[in-house]
């Protein structure tokens, strides 16, 4: 993970959301994290269940926390939708049948208990796999500690009644999404 993060570039953004440079991913997250481009994906099966993941314990931000299906950063010049599909494959071993942008301008800033800041312009996607995913998810252990399929209504309920149990971005995203 450290090697991949050191090589991966994150797109920095100005206050208007325009690209303003790049920074190695390994250096971007700290106590004064600059605004940068990311994305979030909520992956559903044909029964309407959401794939939730528990972040790996070695993650720099919010280790061990339950969250949406997949998150990541588009590379310089990479379309966020293409990056979302790429990361679903890398993190979960899955390829979506459909992908839809549902919150194009979502932006948030969150401070973890250890002072590490996330500050992202984070387009949010819904993705679907038709039928039961074959093969089932095969998560990258450097990214995902655990996973399960849950009803969307249950995830929304947890985000509302026990927000401390989820990543701060997923709580804010769920609040911004239609019921």
What is each stretch, according to the model?
Residues 2-40, 44-46:
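Acidic, metal-coordinating catalytic segment for phosphate/diphosphate chemistry
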Residues 15, 55, 152:
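Residues immediately flanking
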Residues 19-22, 48-54, 134-139:
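Short, well-ordered strand-loop elements centered on a beta-strand within folded domains, enriched
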Residues 24-27, 64, 76, 105-179:
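Nudix hydrolase/Nudix homology domain
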Residues 34, 59, 63, 67, ...:
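Hydrophobic alpha-helical segments and helix-packing faces
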Residues 36, 94-96, 120:
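Short gly/pro-enriched beta-turn/loop segments at secondary-structure junctions
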Residues 38-71:
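A glycine-rich, hydrophobic loop/mini-helix early in the fold
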Residues 52, 69-103, 125:
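The catalytic Nudix box helix
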């Amino acid at each position: 993970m450290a090697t991949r993060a050191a090589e991966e570039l994150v797109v920095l953004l100005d206050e208007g959301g325009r690209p303003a440079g790049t920074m190695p991913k390994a250096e971007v997250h700290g106590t004064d994290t600059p605004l940068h481009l990311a994305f979030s994906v909520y992956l559903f099966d044909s029964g309407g269940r959401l794939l939730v993941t528990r972040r790996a314990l070695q993650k720099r931000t919010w280790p061990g926390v339950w969250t949406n299906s997949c998150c990541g950063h588009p590379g310089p010049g990479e379309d966020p939708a293409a990056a979302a599909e790429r990361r679903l494959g890398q993190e979960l071993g899955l390829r979506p049948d459909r992908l839809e942008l549902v919150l194009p301008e979502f932006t948030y800033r969150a401070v973890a208990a250890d002072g590490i800041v996330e500050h992202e312009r984070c387009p949010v996607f819904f993705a679907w796999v038709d039928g039961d995913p074959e093969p089932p998810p095969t998560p990258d252990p450097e990214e995902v500690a655990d996973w399960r399929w849950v009803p969307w209504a249950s995830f929304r309920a947890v985000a509302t009644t026990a927000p401390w149990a989820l990543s701060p971005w997923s709580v804010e995203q769920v609040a911004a999404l239609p019921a």
